[in-house]
Design a protein with these regions (language model features):
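Ubiquitin-like/PB1-type beta-grasp interaction modules and other compact soluble beta-rich domains
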Residues: 1-66
Length: 67
């Protein structure tokens, strides 16, 4: 199925979770990362149980800290 992830169209297996998507993208779950699914925040504890669907839009946001 096709989804949008951080502005890129991707083909992922049906039934993929956010956790699986992050693995496909080579992303490591970190404290300074936020994942949105269709503009809704997904809590880190829900990555393994949140399933993406055809045409979903996922944004992976890395927070920047510093002064």
């Amino acid at each position: 199925m096709k989804i949008m992830a951080s502005g890129m169209e991707l083909e992922v297996p049906a039934g993929s979770s956010i956790e699986k998507l992050l693995d496909i993208l080579g992303e490591t779950v970190r404290q300074d990362m936020i994942v949105e699914l269709n503009r809704r925040f997904i809590h880190r504890r829900d990555y393994s149980t949140t399933i993406v669907n055809e045409s979903d839009i996922i944004e992976i946001i890395h927070l920047a800290f510093g002064g």
